[in-house]
């Protein structure tokens, strides 16, 4: 019974649960259906709203497009109306232009007829054809233009010359001011002081053997006269004279004077002079800032220390020219080192011109070529005395610096008598030619100005005369550097207005 009761109870409970579950499921299903129906209605409503919105947007866009099209149509109509008005205006202008052209053609025809009549009348009156008159007019115009052009060219040349001369004076004066140079003293002989006159006898030696040995070894004349406590060394070679001076001073200090000792001292003096030469060359290179010279050229520069020209030490002159050329080069923007190098080497031929035949310019050119100097340096050496026409700015600068160094006060010396004779002779040569009225030697004899009679000497005659005078000066007169010959021909015409 209990089993059966439990069975039925469990069955009843199960059926009750099933019924409850079914009822709950049915309820859930109904709620889901209701919710789905609500969402469906909501979706349909949203879709309808979207469609309505799209329809409104399209209608708005269509309205805007219609309005834009209406505006474009109105603008197009306005442009067409404007274009029509312009076309009408152009057509009217063309008609007016055609009428004007017709009027102008008629006027041209009338003018042409009048011109022909006037031309015929002018030809009849003047007796010239139109072509002849045209040529005469062109000839007059050409002459007038040529005259104006010549005047303009002359004015431009004059201004350029004035500006160039002013600039050149400024450059040269600045270079001279910045270059401090010594005044040189002429050295033709060497005077050796003696401790006493007894030393003269020892220098002469028994039967003159010491003095003969000394002169033979040095090639220098040893002059012993009445000058108290001094002897004189005389010779044309300054290097040999310096060797003799050093050797004699050493002998005097040593006191042992005989041929063997003289030979020994001369050899020592020669070595000392060689050292002096080398040192002088190196000092010159250092002082001017010129580098890369061949060692032999440095030695040759040192030899210039013992070389003089009109009393001016050639090495000091070369250093001065190098400085002047460099300073002027810096003012005009030219290679300063090249200018200094050319200035330092311009007189290098004078180092050996007493040993080698030929002028020092030609010797200098050969030396520069031998030691592979630049062509510009070689040309500057060749042109510094006018043997060649200067073709580079460096050559012109070296030529100018050389002239400045040689011409400055105190640089070179001549006796007063020789100076006066040279200037007098210069004026006599100029006055010896027919047609010369008077002449003046100026610039310390470096320029002669000659006044000629214009009725006897014309322009071509002046050219011939200056060449003849120059040639006669070269043949008959000895002078340093060069002389500028200037002929002045002046014609004066005077009339009085009353």
UniProtKB/Swiss-Prot annotation:
Residues 188-273 form the KH domain. One of its GO terms (biological process) is mRNA catabolic process. It is an enzyme of class 3 (hydrolase). The keyword Cell membrane does not apply. Residues 314-407 form the HD domain. Its EC number is 3.1.-.-. Keywords: Endonuclease, Hydrolase, Nuclease, RNA-binding. Disulfide bonds: none annotated. CDD domains: HDc, KH-I_RNaseY. GO terms for cellular component: plasma membrane. Pfam families: HD, KH_1, RNase_Y_N. One of its GO terms (molecular function) is RNA binding. InterPro entries: HD/PDEase_dom (IPR003607), HD_domain (IPR006674), HDIG_dom (IPR006675), KH_dom (IPR004087), KH_dom_type_1 (IPR004088), KH_dom_type_1_sf (IPR036612), Ribonuclease_Y (IPR017705), RNase_Y_N (IPR022711). Endoribonuclease that initiates mRNA decay. HAMAP family: RNase_Y (MF_00335). Belongs to the RNase Y family. NCBIfam families: HDIG (TIGR00277), RNase_Y (TIGR03319). This is Ribonuclease Y. It comes from Pelotomaculum thermopropionicum (strain DSM 13744 / JCM 10971 / SI).
């Amino acid at each position: 019974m209990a089993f059966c009761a439990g069975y039925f109870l469990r069955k009843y409970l199960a059926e009750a649960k099933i019924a409850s579950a079914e009822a709950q499921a049915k309820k859930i299903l109904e709620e889901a259906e209701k919710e789905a129906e609500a969402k469906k209605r909501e979706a349909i409503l949203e879709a309808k709203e979207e469609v309505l919105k799209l329809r409104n947007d399209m209608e708005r866009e269509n309205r805007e497009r219609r309005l834009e099209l209406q505006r474009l149509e109105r603008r197009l109509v306005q442009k067409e109306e404007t274009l029509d008005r312009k076309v009408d205006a152009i057509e009217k202008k063309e008609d007016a232009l055609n009428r004007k052209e017709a009027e102008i053609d008629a006027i041209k025809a009338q003018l042409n007829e009048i011109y022909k009549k006037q031309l015929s009348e002018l030809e009849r009156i003047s007796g010239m054809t139109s072509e002849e008159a045209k040529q005469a007019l062109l000839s007059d115009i050409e002459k007038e233009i040529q005259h104006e052009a010549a005047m303009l060219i002359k004015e431009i040349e004059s201004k350029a010359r004035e500006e160039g001369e002013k600039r050149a004076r400024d450059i040269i004066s600045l270079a001279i001011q910045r270059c401090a140079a010594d005044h040189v003293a002429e050295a033709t002989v060497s005077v050796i002081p003696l401790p006493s006159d007894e030393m003269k006898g020892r220098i002469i030696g028994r039967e003159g053997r010491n003095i003969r040995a000394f002169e033979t070894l040095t090639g220098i004349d040893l002059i012993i006269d009445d000058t108290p406590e001094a002897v004189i060394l005389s010779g044309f070679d300054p290097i040999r004279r310096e060797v003799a001076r050093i050797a004699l001073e050493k002998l005097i200090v040593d006191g042992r004077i005989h041929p063997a000792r003289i030979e020994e001292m001369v050899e020592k003096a020669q070595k000392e002079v060689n050292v002096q030469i080398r040192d002088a060359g190196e000092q010159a290179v250092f002082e001017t800032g010129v580098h890369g010279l061949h060692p032999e050229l440095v030695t040759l520069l040192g030899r210039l220390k013992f070389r003089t020209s009109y009393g001016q030490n050639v090495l000091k002159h070369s250093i001065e020219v190098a400085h002047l050329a460099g300073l002027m080069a810096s003012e005009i923007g030219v290679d300063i080192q090249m200018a200094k190098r050319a200035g330092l080497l311009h007189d290098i031929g004078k180092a050996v011109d007493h040993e080698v035949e030929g002028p020092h310019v030609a010797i200098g050119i050969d030396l520069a070529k031998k030691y592979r100097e630049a062509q510009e340096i070689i040309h500057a050496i060749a042109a510094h005395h006018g043997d060649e026409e200067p073709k580079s700015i460096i050559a012109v600068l070296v030529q100018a610096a050389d002239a400045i160094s040689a011409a400055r006060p105190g640089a070179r010396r001549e006796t007063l008598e020789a100076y006066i004779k040279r200037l007098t002779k210069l004026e006599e040569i100029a006055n010896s030619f027919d047609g010369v009225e008077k002449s003046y030697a100026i610039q310390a004899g470096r320029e002669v100005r000659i006044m000629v009679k214009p009725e006897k000497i014309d322009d071509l005659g002046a050219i011939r005369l200056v060449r003849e005078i120059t040639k006669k000066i070269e043949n008959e007169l000895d002078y340093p550097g060069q002389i500028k010959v200037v002929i002045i021909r002046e014609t004066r015409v005077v009339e009085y207005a009353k």
